[in-house]
Regions:
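Short edge beta-strand/loop segments characteristic of extracellular beta-sandwich folds
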Residues: 456-458, 537-543, 607-611, 622-624
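Short proline/glycine-enriched turn/loop motifs at strand-loop junctions of beta-rich domains
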Residues: 462, 543-548, 615-619, 664
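Beta-strand/beta-sandwich contexts
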Residues: 516-548, 578-579, 589-602
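Substrate-binding/active-site clefts of carbohydrate-active enzymes
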Residues: 26-33, 38-240, 256-286, 301, ...
């Protein structure tokens, strides 16, 4: 894998000029509300890029071909930023704007299909001519990020690093680097691509990471050139002002490599790394792998289990206990479930009004989304009631052209009220969530941030519902018959709360009651980055820290570089690593705890290979060791690296696993075999190995 080192210089040299661009500063992303923009279908800001010379004929001015370009671009997004800001959204997630293929991909019926969605890349170093200019420069992207930052908004870019384009037609998966052709899938002399069959078992981690999907050229992130090229592409967009990077198809991309990528971005500047990992629910066979992936790498996942639960619960005959089950389980499993990206629809599923026709119920679902834990995402047009019922609103009919920017629309005004509440109330933006009561059509939950509390009472019943308010009153700290008005002022038929008296909730209603305490109680809202490198700066966000206090990590006192009531900054320790408990003790003796992952050094990808080892049915192989990725000495499967995969691409079928390891560090590790009952056996003698300074690399081990 080190044969490509001469080519790596080409990528690195093209990156030197980028250092002058300013990058995002540390930010509490928990407080963000994201507006998802499907760029081609949002707003046409410049007509001269509709039918550019290098890719003519892919644009449909009539907008009858749903798989053609329709004219939306980065200039259009920039023009509508004030509209998005007024809605109450503090960040935008834009669909991929990287250079996509120039040739059409005709469908089975011979109809022209264009990469209007942005997910069929050819050059990750350039901006597509349909979204920027014919020079494929960053001018329009720079203008967008500057305008967003001037409005105190953030920009998250979508990067489909798993693949290029279809390998069986059009450009045959071609990969370019700043305009220079590198390879395509059919002529892959440098092994930039995987060449395995399509995934047939979506519960097999090896197939998921190394197999192909949708006939797309599957990039090999363990190839040294590809590794460097993709990391530099992400860094290039970061240098041009991107505040976050969405990893498309995260479940299908090398899991260890994504941790290396996130680490490289975190080491440059604070950044939100978002991973798209499709799950049907918390009972999905890949759910535990998703949790481990997020926890160990500090990557925020899209909350598909919650989205699917909400879509089922609010549909006719639904059950709100599905929502409660997901929230409760994820709160237990994720280091910080407030890092999850929450939504009710997006570009890969039918819009919410396609499955719920009742406008009031849709508004109740939006209110539930915007008052629940996580970082909420509003899909473009939701505020205007935008949807198309053709073929049930499935792809591509979930991506209609934005029709209106009416700021007096009912959904727009409701979202404005909800976002204003969320942005001004720490309990709603960052508070821990706890269920007070839940049934098939009633859901009452608490959000608590120190002494600040919000209680949300949702009823989907078609008639009035009685609710014992005793626990609600206790949660809010009400005294006697103290009254709390509905924070939405009845916008969703909400009512006031009077002490612990029994409530009669109106049909199809949502009430929000708040307690904003004057008491100073330490509360940790977020830690950025969530996976830090030893010696690098870490920021703790929250409330009630006072002007001084004590900070400890894994019981060891730390020196801080700054301390304010809402923010503490320190450097991650050099000698402690792994998943560690962080505690803040304010001067008034109030305490708050959270967790932080610390890695030893910048990370490089190492593939460990174990040949000639036979395991019994039901047994799995793990790697334990003294680094964060290997469990930092823990022998628990959730902490160690693994289970190792069986390399189906080899006749010998050795065990293998790509692991993010600290560059240049000496590491002690052991192999261990587990089954459903626990530890079966482990090596008696450790392997003492020096990790490479550069990756990706391969280390072969034998059992000892």
């Amino acid at each position: 894998m080190k044969k490509q080192s001469s080519r790596v210089a080409l990528v690195v040299s093209s990156f030197i000029a980028l250092q002058s661009f300013s990058m995002a500063q540390a930010a509490d992303f928990h407080r963000d509300i994201i507006y998802q923009v499907f760029t081609d279908r949002f707003f046409n800001g410049r007509k001269d890029n509709d039918n550019p010379p290098q890719s003519p004929g892919l644009f449909d001015a009539s907008r009858k071909n749903w798989k053609a370009y329709w004219g939306g671009d980065l200039a259009g997004v920039k023009e509508k930023l004030p509209y998005i800001k007024s809605l109450g959204c503090s960040a935008i997630w834009i669909s991929p704007c990287i250079d996509n293929i120039n040739k059409p991909e005709n469908d089975a019926a011979g109809n022209m299909v264009a990469p209007y969605h942005g997910y069929h890349a050819r050059d990750f170093m350039r901006v597509d001519e349909h979204f920027g200019d014919s020079d494929m420069s960053f001018k329009d992207f720079d203008a967008l990020t500057k305008a967003a930052h001037d409005l105190d908004m953030r920009v998250f870019v979508d990067m489909p690093f798993n693949h290029t384009s279809p390998y069986n037609h059009a450009e045959y998966g071609a990969l370019y680097d700043a305009g220079q052709f590198r390879s395509d899938v059919e002529n892959d002399r440098n092994k930039y691509f995987h060449h395995l069959p399509a995934v047939s078992d979506f519960n097999d981690p090896y197939q998921l990471q190394y197999g192909t999907i949708f006939y797309l050229g599957d990039l090999d992130q363990e190839n040294q050139y590809v590794d460097t090229y993709l990391k530099q592409a992400a860094a290039k967009f970061q240098s041009h002002g991107a505040d976050g990077t969405r990893l498309d198809a995260a479940k299908h991309m090398n899991w260890g490599w994504q941790h290396v990528l996130a680490n490289s971005l975190y080491n440059r500047a604070d950044h939100l790394v978002l991973g798209e990992w499709w799950l049907t629910g918390i009972d999905d066979p890949m759910y535990k792998d998703a949790v481990k992936f997020a926890n160990k790498g500090g990557i925020s996942l899209y909350d598909f289990p919650l989205a699917n639960a909400i879509r089922k619960a609010f549909a006719e005959g639904g059950d709100l206990t599905l929502v409660d089950q997901v929230v409760s389980q994820e709160n237990k499993d994720f280091i910080d479930s407030n890092e999850l990206l929450t939504f009710i629809d997006n570009h890969d599923m039918s819009r919410f009004p396609n499955i719920v026709k009742d406008k009031k119920v849709t508004q109740l679902a939006l209110a539930t989304l915007l008052t629940s834990r996580g970082i909420p995402i509003i899909y473009y047009g939701t505020e205007q009631g935008l949807y198309d019922d053709t073929k049930g609103g499935e792809d591509p009919y979930d991506r209609p052209m934005m029709q209106s920017f009416d700021q007096s629309a009912d959904n727009y005004k409701l979202i404005q009220k909800l976002t204003a509440l969320r942005q001004t109330n720490l309990a709603l933006s960052s508070g821990k969530q706890r269920t007070l009561f839940c049934s098939k059509d009633l859901y009452v939950f608490e959000r608590r941030a120190g002494a600040d509390v919000a209680v949300v009472a949702l009823s989907l019943k078609p008639k009035e519902a009685l609710l014992d308010a005793a626990e609600v009153a206790t949660s809010l700290g009400l005294v006697d018959n103290e009254v709390r008005q509905d924070a939405l002022a009845g916008a969703l038929s909400g009512i006031a709360l009077e002490g612990a008296k029994q409530l009669s909730l109106p049909p199809q209603s949502l009430s929000i009651w708040l307690t904003n305490s004057n008491k100073s109680s330490a509360f940790i809202a977020a830690i950025r980055p969530p996976a830090a490198t030893a010696g690098k700066a870490v920021t703790v966000y929250g409330k009630g820290f006072g002007t001084s206090g004590k900070l400890s990590l894994a019981g060891e006192a730390l020196t801080t570089s700054s301390w304010a009531d809402d923010k503490i900054v320190f450097n991650a320790p050099l000698l402690k690593h792994g998943r560690l408990v962080l505690e803040v003790e304010a001067a008034n003796s109030s305490k708050a705890k959270s967790e932080l992952v610390v890695v030893e050094n910048k990370l490089v990808l190492v593939r460990f290979v174990v040949p000639d080892l036979k395991l019994a049915a039901g047994e799995q192989l793990y790697i334990s060791g003294n680094t964060s990725a290997l469990g930092a000495g823990s022998l628990l499967p959730n902490d160690m690296a693994g289970p190792m995969l069986v390399n189906q691409d080899s006749d010998e079928k050795p065990y293998m696993l790509a692991v993010p390891m600290p560059a240049g560090e000496s590491v002690e590790l052991k192999l261990a075999v587990y089954n459903a009952k626990g530890l079966v056996r482990a090596e008696t003698k450790p392997h003492n190995l020096k990790m490479p300074q550069l990756g990706p690399s391969v280390i072969t081990m034998t059992w000892q």
